[in-house]
Amino acid sequence: MKKITFVFMFLSSLSVFGQIDLVPDTVRYQQKTGGAIDTFDISIADLPSTFEGGISTLSLNGLSTNSLYQDLSSRKFQRFTKFDPLKFSAIPHLGFAYSFGGQGSQFVRLDYSQAFSEHFLFNLKYDRNAGLGYIQNSGYSENNLRTQLQRDAKGYSFQLKASFQSWDLAHSGGVVNSTSNYDVIDTLGLEFAAINKTDASSSVKLGSAFLKNYFNFSSDSLNHFGLTTHHHYTITNREYLETDNLSAIYSSINIDSSKTRDQFNWARIRNASGAYYSNRKSQLYLDALIEHGYWNFQNLGVNRDTNEISFTTNARIRIKDLVLTNETRLNLIGGFNEWSEEAKLKYKNGKLKVVAGLVLKNSAPDPFQRSYFANNFSYVLSSIEKQTALKVGGNLNWNVKDSVFNFVVSGDFNSLSSAYIFDGDLWRNDSLNSFSFGSVKAKAHLALGNFNIMPTLVYSFDNNGYLPSFQAYTRVYFKARLFEAKKLEAVLGVDASYTTKFNNRVYVPAMDSYNMFVAPGENQTNSLLNLHAFATFGIDEFRFYVRYENIGYFWSDRKINEQFGFPISSTRLRVGLTWDFFN
């Protein structure tokens, strides 16, 4: 099968005729599902974990400042996945990846791209993660479908995005915290450990649709002016079921002492219209829109709703190698005058790339945090106050020498002031609920002939100790082409990691939230040293790998938890493949 060169166009909005990103970045390379053969074995699947949903909390991503920010500001399994940058390919492309391993773990990735014409594009992505889990009653399945359709023309352009996500989770509530139970884990294995919940589960469904229209009224090929409309719809639905002697578990029983069925449905719609202007020569874009928003929150048959009016504006300008973008949102009516500001800077010159960003929000709690009624939880906030969130970060990528040495350094600072945090009963907003944390990360890739090393060092600071102060990761491998024809590419290596101790977070399944009011330091994960081994092979569009993960389980203390009640997971053998089909 002949090699095809793809052009990937990274678009933040629509087309050159009516968008913020007037001149999108263009990158040309040989497309491979999962990325380069050097790392594709870890790009399509998470590391082993005993935590709910199979989500790894001991990975570089799980111990990141971004993960902590999300755990503080949103529910664990109710987060919409961001859309990937839109892709353009000269002929249809289908990328497929599949991996399976111990504990019934399965990972599926599907990526389809087609250009009906040069200015009419379609993308589809589908991900599925599933497994039986390491401990009893911890099976899970996740489905995630995202589609994008874009038409780019002089008179009328549009971009349509739609997604559907679902989680079906069995909740163990973690293992029983007793010395005898951890002795069982040490001698017999994780699957024999007693758990806190034997009959608890939840189902989460997330849907979204986004449509942007651009009507250009100008006949000028350089200057465009016209009408733009934006339409956003999202819906979140969750159901939680539990059967047990609930009086012995919860302090409150509102409906039934033996069976729970908690449920809510949160639907939101926003429609905005306004004017835009763009100049293709100076690469300037400006728009201003007035938006009407409506949301409805249904909780066990009781409905609450609100109408809101807001103002939004977007801007983009390019000055030689520098690109600046800004998005501002201000609520005028119905939303407590919430506001947000998001700015980004991009600079690229030769082998140097710099990206910096700022997000500042002043927002009210969401409907779930304001009022909720369930079998074992019930609360109504007496007053609504706003919380402030700040995220500042950036990274520098320096390709010192092509195919030999690449260096990346990044840093971020995050602050949540007067944040609404779950305390085990309700969402509290007081002067104590302030969190500040950040990190500095340096990573590199050094290639010396067939020998490669990819080290990553992370220093984190966190006023509550939920992040390890130091993390070290390295991938060491040999890469070569085999046999006389040199068509078979092979990679053999190991991944090693070390993390210092950090405080556990306590997950509450019935609320899909963390109780952050457990005293910091009361439950800790001690320092850990881990190891994984892998071998990958590739020829043209087909690639295969085998991994043996969590080798560090052989020497680690089995009483160490990933998070409170969730012990470190045992070893796992996992194999996988990717295949790219063209035309």
Predicted feature residues:
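Outer-membrane beta-barrel proteins
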Residues: 99-101, 105, 129-148, 196-206, ...
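Flexible loop and strand-edge segments within Gram-negative outer membrane beta-barrel domains
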Residues: 136, 158-215, 236-248, 256, ...
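Short strand-turn segments of transmembrane beta-barrel domains in outer membranes
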Residues: 66-70, 76, 80-113, 133
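Transmembrane beta-barrel wall of Gram-negative outer-membrane proteins
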Residues: 106-128, 137-169
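Short, flexible loop/turn elements at secondary-structure junctions
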Residues: 98-102, 116, 128-130, 164, ...
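Exposed, low-structure sequence patches enriched in small/polar residues
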Residues: 18-26, 207-241, 258-583
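Sec-dependent N-terminal signal peptides
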Residues: 4-16
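N-terminal periplasmic/intermembrane-space "pro-region" immediately following the signal or transit peptide
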Residues: 18-79
